[in-house]
Amino acid sequence: MPIWVDADACPKVIKEILYRAADREKVVITFVANQRLSIPASPYLRTLQVSAGFDVADNEIVQRANQDDLVITADIPLAAEVIEKGAIALNPRGERYTESTIRERLNIRDFMDTMRASGIQTGGPASLSQRDRQLFANELDKWLLQQKRKK
């Protein structure tokens, strides 16, 4: 099963974890972005550059992702769409979204959008911590192990 990465906003440190995992586990990872990406040479790493525009990369990932594929994204609506298709969604902080948690996340996101639209400063997410990186690597390893067991 392939891994799809919403690469425009994916932190560099997470991409580096993915580069190593691709070669170690021999799994194909495709980085989808609306800009040119520079990735290490590997038979398992691919880039897919889409045209610039709102949600173009997200729509491409939704179109290509299949059941049990892994999608790496911090984009809540994208995660919701791929979960509907049966794919697995994991954010760069190591949170694996489920059908039940994604609804809650969508509600929080919509609430925060409403607050920002009314002029309230909500701030952004905290920077990625070492714990976040470890959680991400652990969840990635869990998914990779599940894929090995299916073979």
From Swiss-Prot:
Disulfide bonds: none annotated. Pfam families: DUF188. Belongs to the UPF0178 family. This is UPF0178 protein PMI1258.
